[in-house]
Amino acid sequence: MGEILDGKKLARELGEKLGSEVDSLKEHGVSPKLCVINIGDDPASKVYVASKKRKAEKLGIKQVVYQLPADESEEDVLKLIDSLNADPEVSSLMVQLPVPPQINADRVIERIDPEKDVDCLTPANIGRLWQGKHFVEPATAAGIIALLDHYQIDLTGKNAVIVGRSNIVGKPLAALMLERNASVSILHSRSRNLADLTKQADILVCAVGKAEMIKADMVKEGAVVIDVGINRVDGHLVGDVDFAPVKEKASWITPVPGGVGPLTVEFLMEEVIKLTRRQHGLD
């Protein structure tokens, strides 16, 4: 039976460390500031923005949310990004995704100064990530690596299989796992013989947003299973992994909720602090 990878516990420990780091920055006369641009009324986005704001306030990080109407023009969004790029008090900047259809998400993200790109989504920072020369990492991917480190799960030589190829989890996590000398495969909706491939995984990560799609017969005995999915079924939150049966086969497994989720916001705040330190020559 698998042991639990407790993201909540690690998030609490990290929160204490981050609070001390913010205090240290303020002793140098530096105050971290995160600006979030949220366009429209997507319910999930509003929940995530609110959770970030609560965490930022708790740590002493200033967060400013620019809540724009759903019919905002792309031109006006680009102008706002330009002004925030130019503001020396703004240490980090992100555009909450998804954006409304009249706005080209790629153009908007590319406009962000890479030095303030807290989500690590600009082409320059994606390139640095794959070169192993990054100074910022996407929060969820960074949180997963930290969780594995915390439980002393070595990736060297392991077969890591990631189900999901998003720019915010699957692809950057693959880059970070390659840095740790894992052999990485990325699977997706067009992958053939999915179960045959997932059963080869020493480390199996699922990040597709499809409730309980990973069944026990798709998992190798003794695998480490990381569930990034958050799905609501009959009023309850469940992951992408059929938790109870898979737990019987896994050596380690993340629960939903309480696994990867709590780490995402914590690591976003860590990225804010890292960018702030870098901009002020304190890294």
UniProtKB/Swiss-Prot annotation:
Q: Give the top-rank taxon of the lineage listed in the UniProt record for this protein.
A: Bacteria
Which molecular function term from Gene Ontology is one that the record holds?
A: methenyltetrahydrofolate cyclohydrolase activity
Query: What pathway does the annotation place this protein in?
Result: One-carbon metabolism; tetrahydrofolate interconversion
Q: What is an example of a Pfam family matching this protein?
A: THF_DHG_CYH_C
- Any one biological process term the GO annotation gives: tetrahydrofolate interconversion
Recorded hits in PANTHER family, A to Z, give:
C-1-TETRAHYDROFOLATE SYNTHASE, CYTOPLASMIC, C-1-TETRAHYDROFOLATE SYNTHASE, CYTOPLASMIC-RELATED
Could you tell me what this protein is called? Answer: Bifunctional protein FolD
Q: Which reaction does it catalyse?
A: (6R)-5,10-methylene-5,6,7,8-tetrahydrofolate + NADP(+) = (6R)-5,10-methenyltetrahydrofolate + NADPH; (6R)-5,10-methenyltetrahydrofolate + H2O = (6R)-10-formyltetrahydrofolate + H(+)
Per UniProt, which keywords does this protein have?
A: Amino-acid biosynthesis, Histidine biosynthesis, Hydrolase, Methionine biosynthesis, Multifunctional enzyme, NADP, One-carbon metabolism, Oxidoreductase, Purine biosynthesis
Q: Per the record, GO CC terms?
A: cytosol
EC annotation from Swiss-Prot or TrEMBL: 1.5.1.5, 3.5.4.9
The family classification in the record reads: Belongs to the tetrahydrofolate dehydrogenase/cyclohydrolase family.
| Protein role | Catalyzes the oxidation of 5,10-methylenetetrahydrofolate to 5,10-methenyltetrahydrofolate and then the hydrolysis of 5,10-methenyltetrahydrofolate to 10-formyltetrahydrofolate.
Oligomer status and interactors:
Homodimer.
Which InterPro entries did the record assign?
Answer: Aminoacid_DH-like_N_sf, NAD(P)-bd_dom_sf, THF_DH/CycHdrlase, THF_DH/CycHdrlase_cat_dom, THF_DH/CycHdrlase_CS, THF_DH/CycHdrlase_NAD-bd_dom
Binding-site residues, NADP(+)? 164-166, 189, 230
* PROSITE patterns, A to Z: THF_DHG_CYH_1
